[in-house]
């Protein structure tokens, strides 16, 4: 399949540079199968959820993963922590005029000292000195890594708004953005209606922003991310399916975690590990019936995922509609509700 099949024209002014003034006030495009497109607001989501449905949220927490400093040799350096390996060791992307060599010392803001001890592919392995953990050092001295299409520096407002209200476990370098729309009040309304909430963890990596650089998408190599599906979530999903209820994936990261855990048998099983699952049209979904998601970049792997879920023609029409009505796109943008359209590649 050609990458051009997933291209579309997006006016630059539709790329949201800031969150909405009030969390949860975004627009919601309801694009369910066999229904006309509907313009709603995100607070209307419970209208489409039935008692007994299960909504699966990604509880990852965005790290303040960006560090600025210099090498012992004096050159400037920027590190983006991709994955924390243990309390004092992490893998990082490095930007510098010259790549640091093994054994080279690095000094970051706040007096943080680290040594570059090796490499894993394109990533640099950093060993941090001192008694504080990597997470503690980042929380005190790091900067929130906003996506590259947000053309401004992170500010104090982003510290809360680029984080879901249910975030628990540090490890992500990008937010699971569909979850940014949910408020505590909306979660209460869903539970009051009889919906069941469940959680997975998928630590979103910087690879989520990597462009697809091949013409044939089958040749693309997907990045790897760590995920976990707890036994409680697997049980809640299986129970919902047994009673005929729907399973909602809140965001593409929740979807990738669920599908990764169900890939071996076709049924959701508890588990954890690394996943490089690449979902493209023709993929047969095993778990979710509904997907809550933001609007994605042209030619992106996430646009391929939603096209696989709801059908390429359906997504093209929905995106064309959203552009015409000036929905806001990407991380701080508006959201949509999609339904699974079995076996459709159009």
Curated annotation (Swiss-Prot):
UniProtKB keywords: Cytoplasm, Queuosine biosynthesis, S-adenosyl-L-methionine, Transferase
Molecular function GO labels: S-adenosylmethionine:tRNA ribosyltransferase-isomerase activity
Subcellular location: Cytoplasm
Pfam family, one: Queuosine_synth
Catalytic activity: 7-aminomethyl-7-carbaguanosine(34) in tRNA + S-adenosyl-L-methionine = epoxyqueuosine(34) in tRNA + adenine + L-methionine + 2 H(+)
Enzyme Commission number(s) of this protein: 2.4.99.17
Major subcellular location class: cytoplasm
InterPro entries, alphabetized: QueA, QueA_dom1, QueA_dom2, QueA_sf
Biological-process GO terms, alphabetical: queuosine biosynthetic process; tRNA wobble guanine modification
Enzyme class: transferase
Metabolic or biological pathway: tRNA modification; tRNA-queuosine biosynthesis
GO cellular component: cytoplasm
Similarity section: Belongs to the QueA family.
HAMAP family per UniProt: QueA
Role description: Transfers and isomerizes the ribose moiety from AdoMet to the 7-aminomethyl group of 7-deazaguanine (preQ1-tRNA) to give epoxyqueuosine (oQ-tRNA).
Subunit comment: Monomer.
Protein name as it appears in the record: S-adenosylmethionine:tRNA ribosyltransferase-isomerase
Organism: Neisseria meningitidis serogroup A / serotype 4A (strain DSM 15465 / Z2491)
Gene designation: queA
